[in-house]
């Protein structure tokens, strides 16, 4: 029993730390985020690439959310195995409610980056929600602000994620702390605990800063071949849905209802022996692992969705072939068919002298504004990010002895 208490305590403390980091990083991100279909992705990209500390905030928010889902699951599992749910009913109910709110917050925040996975993943989730008998279509339309994605969709999800659910989570957390106030005071008054906590958070910051939160290309509603995939903790439900396509309401309604009903009813259920409670948790973990594993295996045969940098590089190559190759040639020698036909003074990208007399910013300006009567401007047809990716592609492909 001593080891169980230790796991419950550690997972509870880890969950609180992750939750605190999620809330604080979320506040930081909300200061620069614009909840609109046109500005949602540019705001996210600005945070990731140009804002001071934006990369760290996004990584902190994303990975702390995943850590919170995992540590919260560990806490609830071992709290249940310990057999204290009947004795501490109020604590258990608050913990379950808090965990469900966290899952809901993860769902509502998924669409905010407005990249490909966010857009298509949310469309799939809402279509699944619509299969819930009676209330499903009403809830889905309310979240979208209509029957389809529109200008009201992102503001609604942003308000739900950053205000409604965040406030409710803070309220539940406050009530939970009040029920165990003496335990928190005991921990916080322990100097060794405080030092360990501070060092752990600092190491976590250093580690997280080396990883980027996922970001794909901007949402493209016309890309019907895109394969959205949920977060790792929803993969099992996604896979389960494949086996009940004949009755999707089982995935969207019956299964969640049974799961939530069981969690809230645990304190009033017959208190089985610890061994039986352990078997129930292990069985659920095995089901989760099998379904998640099957989902990962099925995904191996699907088209890989590139991240933002890789996707922009692919688009840059296509843009070069579409816009530049007729003049500059496939090898960047300036010997394209139009250059030869009209005797145009096209630069040779493979010559060292060209790169001595130019730089990245100058090339961006030329591509954007054009040069003379022969070089057209592409400022209206390409975004700044697309122009930058095109210039980088030219440097990587043709500059002699190029090094990043």
Feature-to-residue mapping (PLM):
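Membrane-embedded alpha-helical bundles that constitute the cytochrome b-like, heme-associated redox core
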Residues: 1-240, 251-284, 288, 292-300
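Extracytoplasmic electron-transfer domains, predominantly the class I c-type cytochrome c fold
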Residues: 148, 341-399
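C-terminal capping alpha-helices of c-type cytochrome domains
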Residues: 173-178, 260-269, 291, 373, ...
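Short cysteine/histidine-rich zinc-coordinating motifs and their immediately flanking basic loops
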Residues: 185, 337-341
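Interfacial "cap-and-anchor" motif at the non-cytosolic start of specific transmembrane alpha-helices
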Residues: 244-247
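Electrostatic cytochrome c docking/interface patches
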Residues: 297-321
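The canonical Cys-X-X-Cys-His
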Residues: 316, 320-331, 375, 390-394
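Short glycine/serine- and acidic-residue-enriched loop/turn motifs that recur at repeat junctions
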Residues: 332-336
């Amino acid at each position: 029993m001593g080891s169980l208490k230790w796991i419950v305590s550690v997972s509870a403390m880890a969950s609180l730390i992750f939750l605190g980091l999620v809330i604080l990083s979320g506040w930081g991100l909300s200061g620069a985020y614009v909840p609109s279909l046109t500005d949602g992705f540019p705001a996210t990209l600005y945070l990731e690439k140009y804002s001071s500390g934006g990369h760290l905030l996004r990584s902190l928010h994303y990975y702390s959310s995943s850590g919170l889902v995992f540590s919260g699951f560990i806490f609830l599992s071992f709290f249940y195995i310990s057999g204290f749910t009947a004795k501490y009913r109020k604590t258990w109910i608050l913990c379950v409610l808090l965990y469900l709110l966290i899952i809901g917050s993860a769902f509502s925040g998924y669409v905010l980056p407005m990249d490909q996975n966010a857009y298509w993943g949310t469309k799939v989730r809402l279509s699944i929600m619509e299969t819930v008998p009676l209330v499903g279509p009403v809830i889905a339309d309310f979240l979208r602000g209509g029957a389809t994605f529109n200008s009201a969709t992102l503001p609604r999800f942003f308000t739900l994620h950053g205000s409604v659910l965040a406030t409710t989570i803070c309220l539940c957390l406050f009530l939970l702390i009040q029920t165990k106030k003496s335990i928190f005071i005991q921990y916080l008054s322990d100097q060794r605990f405080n030092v360990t906590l501070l060092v752990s958070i600092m190491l976590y910051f250093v580690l997280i800063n080396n990883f980027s939160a996922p970001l794909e290309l901007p949402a493209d509603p016309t890309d019907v071949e895109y394969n959205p995939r949920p977060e790792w903790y929803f993969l099992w439900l996604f896979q389960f849905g494949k086996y009940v396509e004949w009755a999707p309401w089982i995935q969207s309604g019956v299964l969640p209802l049974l799961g939530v009903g069981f969690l809230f009813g645990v304190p009033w259920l017959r208190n089985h022996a610890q061994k039986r409670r352990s078997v129930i948790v292990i069985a659920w973990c095995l089901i989760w692992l099998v379904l998640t594993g099957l989902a990962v295996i099925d995904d191996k045969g699907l088209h890989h969705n590139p991240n933002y940098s890789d996707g922009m590089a692919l688009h840059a190559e296509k843009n070069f072939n579409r816009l530049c190759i007729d003049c500059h040639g496939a090898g960047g020698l300036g010997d394209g068919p139009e250059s030869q036909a009209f005797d145009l003074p096209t630069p040779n990208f493979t010559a060292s002298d060209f790169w001595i007399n130019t730089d990245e910013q100058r090339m961006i300006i030329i591509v954007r504004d054009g040069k003379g009567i022969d070089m057209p401007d592409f400022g209206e047809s390409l975004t700044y990010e697309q122009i930058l990716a095109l210039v980088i592609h030219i440097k990587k492909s043709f500059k002699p002895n190029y090094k990043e």
